[in-house]
């Protein structure tokens, strides 16, 4: 039973570790659903993090239907993760019909070598989550991150529970999207899942001397993983 934290900065990754997370999913652009992190962020986090590090591989926002050039970008990013000694990668690719893009996934998983693989929330916008789950198992993925095809894991609790039953011991189903200390126990009871995914973020005040009078989207407050929020979720998961 444990918590994976989605982190989009060095500070967030270290806060996740300090709060007791079992694993970090490192990404960039978390407010846009997450993208592949920068090389610098990845390298520094890898140097400083002691818990397992998985890296989101997603070259752009939008759907999960990728052309050949985008798959090649992703493959090279996966290779970078291998070179830096990451523990795993977080992948997902669909075809235009909403099914798993098996050739793309096989190419990426081959590039990952011995790294672990999580199939991400592409399952939630697929045509058939149950079929995607079977494909993820066949591909050798360790886990699937899902909100149960809803905006939040709490809303998708019934679908997540069905996926947990379908998966059995073959693969881990990890609820994510809106997971917090306020709902993690309900999600645990309602789904039977054993690991959960959250960003556990809180606001960080801008250090700029004064707000700009005309520009509000640059240089302001931002969100960062909060040690106390992580610890609260972890403690609830450790409660019998």
Curated annotation (Swiss-Prot):
UniProt keyword terms in alphabetical order? Cytoplasm
Cited InterPro entries: CutC-like, CutC-like_dom_sf
Q: Name one GO cellular component term.
A: cytoplasm
Recorded hits in SUPFAM superfamilies, A to Z, give: CutC-like (SSF110395)
- Main location (coarse class): cytoplasm
The UniProt GO MF terms for this protein read:
copper ion binding
- Compartments, record wording: Cytoplasm
Keyword Transmembrane assigned to the entry: answer is: no
Name the family. Answer: Belongs to the CutC family.
Q: Which HAMAP family match?
A: CutC
Please report the name of this protein according to its UniProt entry: PF03932 family protein CutC
* Origin species: Xanthomonas campestris pv. campestris (strain ATCC 33913 / DSM 3586 / NCPPB 528 / LMG 568 / P 25)
């Amino acid at each position: 039973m444990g918590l994976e934290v989605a982190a989009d900065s060095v500070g967030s990754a270290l806060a996740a570790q300090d709060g007791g997370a079992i694993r970090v999913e490192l990404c960039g652009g978390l407010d846009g659903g997450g993208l592949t992190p920068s090389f610098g962020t990845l390298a520094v986090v890898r140097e400083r993090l002691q818990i397992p590090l998985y890296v989101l591989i997603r070259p752009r926002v939008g759907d999960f239907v990728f052309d050949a050039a985008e798959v090649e970008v992703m493959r090279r990013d996966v290779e970078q993760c291998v070179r830096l000694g990451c523990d795993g990668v977080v992948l997902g690719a669909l075809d235009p019909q909403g099914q798993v893009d098996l050739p793309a996934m096989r190419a990426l998983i081959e590039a990952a070598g011995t790294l672990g693989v999580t199939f991400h929330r592409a399952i939630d916008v697929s045509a058939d989550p149950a079929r995607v789950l079977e494909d993820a198992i066949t591909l050798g993925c360790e886990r699937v991150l899902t909100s149960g095809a809803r905006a939040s894991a709490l809303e998708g609790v019934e679908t997540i529970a069905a996926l947990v039953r379908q998966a059995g011991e073959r693969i881990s189903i990890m609820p994510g999207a809106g997971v917090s200390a306020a709902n993690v126990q309900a999600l645990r009871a309602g789904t039977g899942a054993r690991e959960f995914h959250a960003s556990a973020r809180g606001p960080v005040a801008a250090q700029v001397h004064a707000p700009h009078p005309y520009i509000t989207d640059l240089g302001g407050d931002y969100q960062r993983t909060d040690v106390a929020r992580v610890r609260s979720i972890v403690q609830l998961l450790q409660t019998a």
